[in-house]
C-alpha cells in the first residue's frame, strides 16, 4: 500500500530536484561581504542546475557566531530559493560543498559563468526577526528620509589599520567639510543620519551638528592602532550575541539606503550594499576615493 502521509508526498515532490548545501570560510569578513560572495556561489550553483541552500557555519570562525555550530546565514537571512534546511535534509538528492573560500578570482569566474541567473528570494532577503529589528529603528531614527543626508563614516580599523589593497577612508574632519558643502548645495537637506561603528565619531559629529544629526542605538567601539574590529570582538571579555552584532549593521545600512543623498568615507561592503538597496534613487552621491593602502 503506498504511503499517503504529507511528509512522503513532500519528498515525492522534491525527488527530481538536486539541492546543493553551501558552506564557506570567511573568518574576518564583514556581513555584507559574506552575503555578496555567498550569493555568488549560490547563483553559480543555480546556473548549473542545483537549488542552492545555505548552511553557513564557517568552521566556527565568525564573530557573528554564538558557538562553533551556529549557522550565521539562518541568523539573518532567508533561503534564496525558499526551501528550508529541514526540507532539504529530508529530500532525495542532496549534495554538500566542502567549506571553502572564494576569493576575488574565484568569485569573478563564478559571476561570469552564472551569467544572468538570479536568485528567487521568494520570502525576501532578511528573516522575520531582522525585518522587525530594521522597522523599529527606521521609525525611531529616520523620521524624515526625504530631508536627510546619509553619511557612511567608517572609523575603527578602517582608519587605525592599513590593510594591503584596502581602500583608504576619509577622516572625520574631511567628512565634516564635505557634509557642510552638501548641505549648502541642497537646502532641502535639514538632517544628517550617520552610519558608523566608531564611538569617537558619534561624539565628534554630535558636538558639531547637535540635534541635526542622528545615529541608531547600536553599540559602538574604538579600536587601537593596528587592531582589527573582528579581533576586538573575539577578545571581548563579555561576548555579545552575534545576532545583534549583525542586525545593528544591517539596520544602520538599511536606513542609509533610504536617505535622500549619500556621502561615504570610502569603499567597503557596506557602501556596496547601501547602493544596491537604494537602487539608484539617491539625488546626490559622493564617495571619497583616496586610493588603496600599499
Residue ranges and their predicted role:
Residues 13-19, 61-189:
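Secretory-pathway luminal glycosyltransferase catalytic domains
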Residues 13-56:
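N-terminal pre-catalytic "stem/leader" segment of glycosyltransferase-like enzymes
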Residues 8, 189, 258-260:
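Short, well-ordered alpha-helix to beta-strand connector turns
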Residues 153-158, 183-240:
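Catalytic donor nucleotide-activated moiety binding site of glycosyltransferases and closely related
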Residues 23-25, 34, 54-57, 152-153, ...:
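Short His-Asn-centered micro-motif
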Residues 1-8, 12:
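Single conserved hydrophobic/aromatic residue that forms the stacking wall/gate
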Residues 65-80, 201-211, 275-277:
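Short, aromatic/basic amphipathic alpha-helical patches
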Residues 29-30, 39, 249-292:
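A donor-sugar binding/catalytic signature common to diverse glycosyltransferases
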Amino acid at each position: 500500500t503506498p504511503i499517503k502521509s504529507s511528509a512522503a508526498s513532500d519528498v515525492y515532490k522534491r525527488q527530481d530536484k538536486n539541492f546543493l548545501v553551501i558552506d564557506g570560510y570567511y573568518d574576518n569578513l564583514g556581513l555584507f561581504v559574506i552575503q555578496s560572495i555567498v550569493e555568488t556561489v549560490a547563483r553559480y550553483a543555480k546556473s548549473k542546475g542545483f537549488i542552492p541552500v545555505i548552511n553557513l557555519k564557517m568552521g566556527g570562525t565568525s564573530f557573528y557566531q554564538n558557538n562553533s555550530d551556529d549557522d550565521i546565514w539562518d541568523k539573518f537571512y532567508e533561503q534564496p530559493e525558499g526551501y528550508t534546511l529541514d526540507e532539504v535534509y529530508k529530500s532525495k538528492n542532496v549534495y554538500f560543498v566542502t567549506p571553502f573560500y572564494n576569493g576575488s578570482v574565484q568569485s569573478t569566474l563564478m559571476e561570469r559563468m552564472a551569467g544572468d541567473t538570479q536568485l528567487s528570494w521568494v520570502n525576501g532577503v532578511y528573516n522575520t526577526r531582522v525585518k522587525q529589528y530594521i522597522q523599529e529603528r527606521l521609525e525611531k531614527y529616520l523620521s524624515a528620509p526625504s530631508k536627510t543626508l546619509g553619511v557612511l563614516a567608517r572609523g575603527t580599523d578602517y582608519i587605525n589599520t592599513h590593510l594591503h589593497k584596502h581602500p583608504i577612508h576619509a577622516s572625520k574632519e574631511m567628512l565634516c567639510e564635505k557634509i557642510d558643502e552638501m548641505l549648502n548645495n541642497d537646502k532641502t537637506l535639514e538632517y544628517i543620519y550617520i552610519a558608523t561603528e566608531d564611538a569617537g565619531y558619534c561624539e565628534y559629529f554630535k558636538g558639531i551638528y547637535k540635534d541635526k544629526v542622528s545615529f541608531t542605538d547600536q553599540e559602538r567601539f574604538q579600536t587601537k592602532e593596528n587592531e582589527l574590529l573582528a579581533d576586538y570582538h573575539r577578545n571581548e571579555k563579555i561576548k555579545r550575541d552575534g545576532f545583534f552584532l549583525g542586525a545593528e549593521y544591517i539596520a544602520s545600512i538599511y536606513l542609509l539606503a533610504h536617505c535622500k543623498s549619500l556621502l561615504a568615507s570610502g569603499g567597503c561592503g557596506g557602501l556596496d550594499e547601501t547602493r544596491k538597496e537604494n537602487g539608484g534613487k539617491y539625488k546626490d552621491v559622493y564617495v571619497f576615493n583616496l586610493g588603496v593602502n600599499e
